[in-house]
Design a protein with these regions (language model features):
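Divalent metal-dependent hydrolysis catalytic cores, especially in the metallo-beta-lactamase
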Residues: 1-23, 36-49, 66, 75-90, ...
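Short, small-residue-enriched loops and turns at beta-alpha junctions
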Residues: 16-18, 49, 55-58, 95-100, ...
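Short, electropositive alpha-helical surface patch
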Residues: 20-33, 203-208
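Generic structural signal for well-ordered alpha-helices
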Residues: 21-28, 68-72, 132, 193
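Conserved phosphate-binding/catalytic loop of the ribokinase/pfkB sugar-kinase fold
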Residues: 48-70
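Glycine-centered positions in the ABC transporter ATPase nucleotide-binding domain
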Residues: 259-260
Length: 264
């Protein structure tokens, strides 16, 4: 919350199924006392081996009913997103086929469908700036900033774990020690919005929308719901009072309110 994130969906990376089930149960148990936690996102284990990124290949599985049922049972209603969900493209341009004029792949299919929300990691490393601009042009008002942040976020460079995999963080960039694959990020949404406005020249409206209203819409939290009760994503009557006060010059977070409670 020091960086202005008032609500979060916690991403769980591929692990042995028992570990993933235990992690889901932990998230579900935390939600009662932590209104900022909206649920869990499973990034795996149902991934293609050829596009596994920084996931343990030994833990990848086919989405057979037995495995799906175990995860759903463990989640007990807290599961908000799985990366294979057709309505959300997880971090566009990363861990997928790129654009090619004879092999268009998933990106054109996603941007052509107005129902699809497109996630994007705006750290200047996962996706270069010209491609970020291209993404916003392809899918206006459908880009959702995500961090893909791992344990090294807001911490010094060094050695960390991503699940059971060793990760080296150098200059803020996380890579697997074994093969150099990108292993998540150290990005915060504060920095993603700062980059969008100050470095990429996006309007404040577009940058803030990508970190607030668009993600809220993707999960159905832009309207009254059983989890947050009041809708999220706008400064408007009837919405939860999640508010940030930003420095007008640097766009750094100075004060944070969550559900009308001053946190910083």
């Amino acid at each position: 919350m020091m960086h202005g994130t008032t609500r979060q969906v916690l991403s769980l990376i591929t692990n042995p199924l028992d570990v993933m089930c235990a992690n889901l149960q932990t998230v579900r148990g935390m939600m009662g006392a932590r209104p900022d936690i909206l649920g869990a996102h499973l990034e795996g284990p149902f991934l293609a081996l050829s596009r596994k990124g920084a996931h343990d290949p030994e833990c990848l599985k086919d989405p057979v009913p037995e495995y799906v049922d175990r995860l759903l049972h463990a989640a007990n209603g807290c599961l908000r997103q799985i990366t294979i969900a057709p309505g959300i493209m997880t971090h566009m341009f990363n861990a997928m086929n790129g654009l090619h004029h004879r092999e268009p792949g998933p990106i054109p299919a996603a941007v052509e469908d107005p129902r699809v929300t497109v996630e994007l990691i705006n750290d200047g490393f996962h996706v270069q700036d010209p491609m970020v601009r291209l993404g916003f042009g392809f899918a206006p008002h459908r880009i959702a900033f995500v961090t893909d942040a791992m344990a090294a976020t807001d911490c010094p460079d060094g050695h960390y774990l991503l699940g059971a995999l060793d990760v080296n963080v150098i200059d803020g960039h996380a890579r697997l020690a074994s093969n150099g694959a990108i292993a998540g990020s150290t990005l915060t949404l504060e920095k993603a919005v700062q980059r969008a406005v100050l470095e990429l020249g996006f309007t404040p409206t577009d940058a803030v929308e990508a970190a607030t209203l668009i993600p809220a819409k993707a999960f159905g939290f832009d309207r009254a719901n059983p989890v947050t009760k009041q809708p999220l994503g706008l400064l408007a009557s009837g919405y939860a009072a999640d508010v940030l006060l930003l420095n007008p010059a640097t766009w750094a977070v100075e004060h944070v309110w969550c559900d009308a409670h001053l946190l910083r």
